């Protein structure tokens, strides 16, 4: 089981999404639990590596336009939650 670490920007993203009431935050928690346990995500979540400045990060879809960007640090056994939000919010 991985240890979860959250970056400051992720915390702000979650707070903003929670406050808006537009997203079912239990979906995010479910994805995080699966990743924490080291389980593979279903193809519906389209997990994939990112490129360029994000090349050491992964992205998955919680909903069609709701993403989670994360990193797995195998040396420290950590799941690092980096960002969450829409394509337009994350990749400006």
Locate predicted features.
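Basic, Lys/Arg-enriched alpha-helical interface segments
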Residues: 1-64, 73-79, 88-92
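Short, charged interaction patches at domain edges and termini
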Residues: 70
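A short hydrophobic beta-strand segment most commonly corresponding to one strand
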Residues: 81-83
